[in-house]
From Swiss-Prot:
InterPro entries: Aminotrans_II_pyridoxalP_BS, Aminotransferase_I/II_large, AON_synthase_class-II, AONS_Archaea/Proteobacteria, AONS_Proteobacteria, PyrdxlP-dep_Trfase, PyrdxlP-dep_Trfase_major, PyrdxlP-dep_Trfase_small
UniProt xrefs under SUPFAM superfamilies: PLP-dependent transferases (SSF53383)
Sites where the protein binds pyridoxal 5'-phosphate: G108, F109, S179, H207, T233
Catalytic reactions on record: 6-carboxyhexanoyl-[ACP] + L-alanine + H(+) = (8S)-8-amino-7-oxononanoate + holo-[ACP] + CO2
Residue positions where N6-(pyridoxal phosphate)lysine is found in the record: K236
Enzyme Commission number, as recorded: 2.3.1.47
Protein name per Swiss-Prot or TrEMBL: 8-amino-7-oxononanoate synthase
Pfam families, alphabetized: Aminotran_1_2
Physiological role: Catalyzes the decarboxylative condensation of pimeloyl-[acyl-carrier protein] and L-alanine to produce 8-amino-7-oxononanoate (AON), [acyl-carrier protein], and carbon dioxide.
Biochemical pathway: Cofactor biosynthesis; biotin biosynthesis
Length: 384
């Protein structure tokens, strides 16, 4: 098979399965409204959970940072790309979440890949929740360490896997809030079992940080758990982009030596770090509390209104509210119907989710109003 035949066959297989991914250029897509092709939609696909992407204080901080530092960092943090703006942000993140150190990364995907690649060797073992994010599972599969997956949130299965002999170290990997189901991991139980087997715990809290817990400190803080490795990202609750790894001093020093994604990537712009500091200030403030309370009320309203729909409703009280349809083509049809009625919703299909669980991944944000939720419910019930 020549290259073109290989590529064509892969694309044809996706088309036949109604699993071909497409991008849609939008004029505005992060806030309450999405604008595409000169049409305006209520946006139920954004991860901007607190509605901070258009916050004037954060925008102003980015603009002032660009005036001070320029629009780029100019290099890796190991060369000339680590500014005082990066340093102060790392210190503020560490203090906020109760860790000795924080290290900034350009994305959550990069952070997860970097940590697992740097930490694991062939004599070690990775034990990951089966529904962990693609960045975690891909990093684990590329690692020299064997990968074992435990059934979703099944602590008994996790304990059984950890109990089998391992010549090296064991790293347990999970998410705080799962990106496709919106449910939460039982972190206290997972940490207890992990410690019983002398393992370390790595939690990706991309969808919890900023959104839940006291001052938005996330899933681990809420469940009174402190994993050895905590990954937080800034494209969801923070309304910006980027990520950080929270850890001990020695682990941070180790990652600075061996995390290749950190060493060989250009750092995020200092202006972005300034914007993230402003976002963190909002998240920790009374305004942040008010936004989280509003989001919780919207979630309650939505869940009360979808109980009688002919879809499987996930066990989620997070901003992620998937309606599991099952069939790929049915999910696509429903998403298109919603768009025709002015609600922008994304159909998520395999391989992003397991076969037979295609869904509408609805996300609610603090930028929404109660009437937006009521409109969505009206359309879902066929009364649009």
């Amino acid at each position: 098979m020549i290259w073109q035949e290989k590529i064509d066959a892969a694309l044809d297989a996706r088309r036949v399965a109604d699993a071909l991914r497409r991008r849609y250029p939008v004029a505005q897509g992060a806030g309450r409204w999405l604008v595409a092709d000169d049409c305006q939609y209520l946006n139920f696909s954004s991860n901007d959970y607190l509605g901070l992407s258009h916050h004037p204080q954060i925008i102003r901080a980015w603009q002032q940072g660009a005036d001070q530092f320029g629009v780029g960092s100019g290099g890796s943090g190991h060369v000339s790309g680590y500014s005082v703006a990066h340093q102060v942000l790392e210190e503020e993140l560490a203090e906020w979440l109760g860790y000795s150190r924080a290290l900034l990364f350009i994305s959550g995907f990069a952070a997860n890949q970097a940590v697992i690649a740097a930490m694991m060797a062939k004599e070690d073992r990775i034990v990951a929740d089966r529904l962990s994010h693609a960045s975690l599972l891909e990093a684990a599969s590329l690692s020299p360490s064997p990968l074992r997956r435990f059934a979703h949130n099944d602590v008994t299965h996790l304990a059984r896997l950890l109990a089998s002999p391992c010549p090296g170290q064991q790293l347990v990997v999970t998410e705080g809030v799962f990106s496709m189901d919106g449910d939460s991991a039982p972190l206290e139980e997972i940490q207890q079992v992990t410690q019983q087997h002398d393992g370390w715990l790595m939690v990706d809290d991309a969808h919890g940080t900023g959104v839940i817990g006291e001052q938005g400190r996330g899933s681990c803080w809420l469940q009174k758990v402190k994993p050895e490795l905590l990954v937080v990202t800034f494209g969801k609750g923070f309304g910006v982009s980027g990520a950080a790894v929270l850890c001990s001093n020695t682990v941070a020093d180790y990652l600075l030596q061996f995390a290749r994604h950190l060493i060989y990537s250009t750092s995020m712009p200092p202006a972005q770090a300034q914007a993230l500091r402003a976002s963190l200030a909002v998240i920790r403030s009374d305004e942040g509390d008010a936004r989280r309370e509003k989001l919780a009320a919207l979630i309650t309203r939505f869940r009360a209104g979808v109980q009688d729909l002919p879809f499987t409703l996930a066990d989620s009280w997070s901003a992620i509210q998937p309606l599991i349809v099952g069939d790929n083509s049915r999910a696509l049809q429903l998403a298109e119907k919603l768009r025709q009625q002015g609600c922008w919703v994304t159909a998520i299909r395999p391989p992003t989710v397991p076969a037979g669980t295609a869904r509408l991944r609805l996300t609610l944000t603090a930028a929404h109003e109660m009437q937006d939720i009521d409109r969505l419910l009206e359309v879902l019930h066929g009364n649009g």
